[in-house]
């Protein structure tokens, strides 16, 4: 009996160690448009190809990777249609994509870092949509006195959206100083030349 117990404990310990040096990503795409899903690791100045797998007929896919520490990854159809994960050893990440694009509506569980990255990305996307809408309205105004008042209102609203994004990112960084996801909050951009945290004042 003791020998059996020792064997069982050993098996669980080995399995536990094996699980802690790898992570899995299991996903389901409700409307798969392409055959393959690509996984890249994000490094400072480049993407490193990790794997590409075929999406099954029911829209499911699964990756299993060796990992020694948390890292950012891009998963999606291409370099322009993807989402970002922050995967750590031992995690069992589950994903659901609801649209035609992997960069669209999705859910992720089983990874606190990836859930936080999703929150940051969705908040930025919503902020950028508001800013784009304000730019469009602003550009369509005519140059009369009434439009001058409207311009001022739109400029104030534009500034308010930027300040709110900046405030939320700072709050996340301050409350999650040990999370690698805080790096995402630091380096998010409104456009190619403007960081969310940049304040011109």
Where are the model-predicted features located?
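A non-transmembrane, solvent-exposed segment enriched in polar/low-complexity residues
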Residues: 17-167, 171-172
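Sec-dependent bacterial lipoprotein signal peptides
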Residues: 1-15
